[in-house]
Amino acid sequence: MPTPKIFESEYRFCLILWEHEPIKSMELVKLCREKLDWSKTTYTVIKRLCERGVIRNENAIVTSIISKEEAQMSELEEMMDKKFENSLPAFIAAFGRKQALSDAQIEEIRRIIEG
């Protein structure tokens, strides 16, 4: 089953959830008010993400179904497919042109590639 799409504002919400879960929905609303300047929007986002299978809200306790890593991987796969024709070298080349990589970053990428 593919990972449900998490849009940008929903992702910011999920970042708060992933950091604090499990969390009471009232406490999550309070955090979103403080960090995102949301009030009633939070309840709408909770409902929408529950309907799409991203989070669950049981007995007013909100937890994630989709992990941060799963959401990041899904977004990366979509971007790689749409923008780079699934070419890791094209992606790395584009990233390297935009931002100079430090020797440490280059070494870390090398270690990851070599497995």
Predicted regions and their residues:
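Short acidic, hydrophobic short linear motifs in intrinsically disordered regions
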Residues: P22-C32
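Hydrophobic residues on short alpha-helical segments
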Residues: Y11-L17, I92
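The C-terminal cap of the DNA-recognition helix in HTH/winged-HTH DNA-binding domains
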Residues: E19, C50-E51, R97
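Amphipathic alpha-helical dimerization/coiled-coil segments
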Residues: E77-G115
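Short, cationic-aromatic polyanion-contact patches
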Residues: T3-S9, A60-M80
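Short helix-coil-helix linker/hinge
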Residues: I6-S9, P22, E85
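Short amphipathic alpha-helical interaction segments
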Residues: L36-E51
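A short, conserved structural fragment
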Residues: C50-A60
